[in-house]
């Protein structure tokens, strides 16, 4: 009898919880419509995988890409709407959050065609790969709009767990397993440190979890200038430093880049940074509003270390992926200038603009590396020598993307860095901008060193990998070449059309 009553109570409680969740989704679902499209795409992928055979593999790519494109379209239709806080204050929708969501969706959309041929050649499980990519994208989108500490943590872990699984997707590769273990341990440690900082904020604000309410709570408890806030700031900055691969919290990055499948590295190298930047701008600008001088100083130190160490260590690398790992550490150091400047001198606008350019430059470079790796089986920089003699299109594409990453005019990277440094100079960050300029010149050296190798025609320098290289036609139906072409064109011409991009970025400021 007692068991029967307890069972009835459990059913009633479960029904109430379900009805409450359904009520929330019914009245707030329109505010997360782009995310709902991705959820529907995930469910559709699972259903087709359970009821189909290997012949239907093209459908998996089509469903994934279509759901991402429709989600982007839904975001664009919602542009310029009034800011809305939904789900009882847990989620915020505004232009600033949506531009980061757009960047994440754009990265994922470009990464899927980049992965098709790689998955077919390595015989990886296609459905699980696409599920992890879409789920990571979903987690990143929720992270961009999360308005309380719990939602931030859940969305961050949703993204992180999928990232760990993707990095170890080639289970038979020992390097991939090693990369996954390092990524998991370092990622788990960084999440723990971040949560420790959140707990300090929660306690000091009197038990508040919403970002704006934390500020009000700190004012009410008179704790906004207490030593506890400094402790919370240090913990959260360290946690964000790990997620952004800022020096000296960058040790995991080169090993994960080298050991993970190249399309996965391409995906993580941009989406993880966009999602973490969306979190950093909001978590530092809102709860730590009264400690702006302190977190500005911390970020300046991390940015200087990242720019110097990232570019110096990149010079010594022999692996293309490790070189790009250290290069990305230097690149994120430049982007931090935009966060420090803030919205007073178009700092956020310059950061968003540069991240858009960085997506095209970085993904274009990785597309070239994926193609070369599939055709030769090597990742060594020396093995790229003489590629221009065998595949001019691939060599020129890689050269343009590297030059854009280095910031040479008239490519997009030059205009992105120019505006970023100009905003920093206007804000009085003279030393930081000077370091950025010097390290940018340094980065051009190792990019040009690779380009010189690509264009060499001396037989004694050409390795057997290039001598036996399979020549590809100028026009190809290869999906990787499609992604590469789009990214190369964007890396070349986006800087010329910078004014409308800047206008859109300036509209996103909250």
From Swiss-Prot:
- Enzyme Commission number: 7.1.1.-
Membrane spanning residue stretches: 31-51, 59-79, 99-119, 124-144, 149-169, 184-204, 229-249, 261-281, 295-315, 323-343, 354-374, 395-415, 418-438, 484-504
Taxonomic superkingdom? Eukaryota
Which InterPro entries does the record match to this protein? Answer: NADH-Q_OxRdtase_suN/2 (IPR010096), ND/Mrp_TM (IPR001750), Ndh2_N (IPR045693)
Subcellular localization is given as: Plastid, Chloroplast thylakoid membrane
Q: Which GO terms describe its cellular component?
A: chloroplast thylakoid membrane
The disulfide bridges present are: none
Q: Which GO terms describe its biological process?
A: ATP synthesis coupled electron transport; photosynthesis, light reaction
What is a single molecular function from GO for this protein?
NADH dehydrogenase (ubiquinone) activity
Q: Which UniProt keywords apply?
A: Chloroplast, Membrane, NAD, NADP, Plastid, Plastoquinone, Quinone, Thylakoid, Translocase, Transmembrane, Transmembrane helix, Transport
Family that this chain belongs to:
Belongs to the complex I subunit 2 family.
Q: What PANTHER family does the entry give?
A: NADH DEHYDROGENASE
Subunit = NDH is composed of at least 16 different subunits, 5 of which are encoded in the nucleus.
* Protein name (Swiss-Prot/TrEMBL): NAD(P)H-quinone oxidoreductase subunit 2 A, chloroplastic
Tell me the gene name: ndhB1
């Amino acid at each position: 009898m007692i068991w029967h009553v307890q069972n009835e109570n459990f059913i009633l409680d479960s029904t109430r919880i379900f009805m409450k969740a359904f009520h929330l989704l019914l009245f707030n679902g329109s505010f997360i419509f782009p995310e709902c499209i991705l959820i529907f795409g995930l469910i559709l992928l699972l259903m087709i995988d359970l009821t189909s055979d290997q012949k239907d593999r093209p459908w998996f790519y089509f469903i994934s890409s279509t759901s991402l494109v429709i989600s982007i379209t839904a975001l664009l239709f919602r542009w310029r709407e009034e800011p809305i806080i939904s789900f009882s204050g847990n989620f915020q929708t505004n232009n600033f959050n949506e531009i980061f969501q757009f960047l994440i969706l754009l990265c994922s959309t470009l990464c899927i065609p980049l992965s098709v041929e790689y998955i077919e050649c390595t015989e990886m499980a296609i459905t699980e790969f696409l599920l992890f990519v879409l789920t990571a994208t979903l987690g990143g989108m929720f992270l961009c709009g999360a308005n309380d500490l719990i939602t931030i943590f859940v969305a961050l872990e949703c993204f992180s767990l999928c990232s760990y699984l993707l990095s170890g997707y080639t289970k038979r590769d020992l390097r991939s397993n090693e990369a996954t273990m390092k990524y998991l341990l370092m990622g788990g440690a960084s999440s723990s440190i971040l949560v420790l900082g959140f707990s300090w904020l929660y306690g000091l604000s009197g038990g508040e979890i919403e970002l704006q309410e934390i500020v009000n709570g700190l004012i009410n408890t008179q704790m906004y200038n207490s030593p506890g806030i400094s402790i919370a700031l240090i913990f959260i900055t360290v946690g964000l430093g790990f997620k952004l691969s800022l020096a000296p919290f960058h040790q995991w990055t080169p090993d994960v880049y080298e050991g993970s499948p190249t399309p996965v590295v391409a995906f993580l190298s941009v989406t993880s940074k966009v999602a973490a930047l969306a979190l950093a701008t909001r978590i530092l600008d809102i709860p730590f509003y009264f400690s702006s001088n302190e977190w500005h100083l911390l970020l300046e130190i991390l940015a200087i270390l990242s720019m110097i160490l990232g570019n110096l260590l990149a010079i010594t690398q022999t692996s293309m992926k490790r070189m790009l790992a250290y290069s990305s550490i230097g690149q994120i150091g430049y982007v931090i200038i935009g966060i420090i400047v803030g919205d007073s001198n178009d700092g956020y606008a310059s950061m968003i603009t540069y991240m858009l350019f960085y997506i095209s430059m970085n993904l274009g470079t990785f597309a070239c590396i994926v193609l070369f790796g599939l055709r030769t089986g090597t990742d060594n920089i020396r093995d790229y020598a003489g590629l221009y003699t065998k595949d001019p299109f691939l060599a020129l594409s890689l050269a343009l993307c590297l030059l854009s990453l280095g910031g040479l005019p008239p490519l997009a990277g030059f205009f992105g860095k120019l505006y970023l440094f100009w905003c920093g100079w206007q804000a009085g960050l003279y030393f930081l901008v000077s370091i950025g300029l010097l390290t940018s010149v340094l980065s051009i050296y190792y990019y040009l060193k690779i380009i010189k190798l690509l264009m060499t025609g001396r037989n004694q320098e050409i390795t057997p990998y290039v001598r036996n290289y399979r020549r590809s036609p100028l026009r190809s139906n290869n999906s990787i070449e499609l992604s590469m072409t789009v990214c190369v064109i964007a890396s070349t011409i986006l800087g010329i059309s910078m004014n409308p991009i800047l206008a859109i970025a300036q509209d996103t400021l909250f």
